[in-house]
């Protein structure tokens, strides 16, 4: 996914994860993750290698590879793969 595609994918709207949590990525680089009414605020960015990463204060950084989730020719969500741990999770556009 190109940097332009990353930005477009993340800022396209609210996403809902498989566990019901929601997240919004703002063009400014701010992000809000809400799980069972509890909101956590962080930052997202594209690093020097053109890869997506999250920063959650005070010091946690998480690098991810992103892939589109496509159904019947339409983009319906994103698959996140942690670049260091290999864990994966999916989210759909709300």
Predicted regions located by residue number:
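Lipid interaction determinants
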Residues: 1-94
């Amino acid at each position: 996914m190109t940097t332009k595609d990353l930005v477009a994918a993340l800022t396209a709207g609210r996403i809902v994860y498989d566990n019901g949590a929601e997240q919004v990525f703002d063009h400014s680089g701010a992000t809000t993750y809400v799980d069972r009414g509890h909101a956590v605020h962080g930052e997202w960015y594209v690093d020097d290698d053109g890869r997506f990463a999250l920063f959650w204060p005070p010091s946690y950084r998480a690098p991810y590879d992103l892939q589109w989730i496509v159904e019947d020719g339409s983009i319906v969500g994103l698959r996140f793969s942690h670049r260091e741990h290999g864990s994966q999770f999916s989210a759909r556009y709300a």
